[in-house]
Amino acid sequence: MDIVSFAWAALMVVFTFSLSLVVWGRSGL
């Protein structure tokens, strides 16, 4: 795996995680 693929994978993980936190925060959990 090259560094570009790793960077994109990490970015997607961080984006998904923060989006989940926002959704959970808005629903009051």
Swiss-Prot record:
Q: Membrane-crossing residues?
A: 3-23
- What are the protein's GO molecular function terms? electron transporter, transferring electrons within cytochrome b6/f complex of photosystem II activity
Q: Which UniProt keywords apply?
A: Chloroplast, Electron transport, Membrane, Photosynthesis, Plastid, Thylakoid, Transmembrane, Transmembrane helix, Transport
Keyword Lipid metabolism listed? The answer is: no
Topological relation to the membrane, as annotated: Single-pass membrane protein
Cellular component, GO, one term: chloroplast thylakoid membrane
* Primary role: Component of the cytochrome b6-f complex, which mediates electron transfer between photosystem II (PSII) and photosystem I (PSI), cyclic electron flow around PSI, and state transitions.
**Name of the featured protein:** Cytochrome b6-f complex subunit 8
Species source reads Phalaenopsis aphrodite subsp. formosana (Moth orchid)
Q: What is the lineage of its organism?
A: Eukaryota, Viridiplantae, Streptophyta, Embryophyta, Tracheophyta
Gene that this sequence comes from: petN
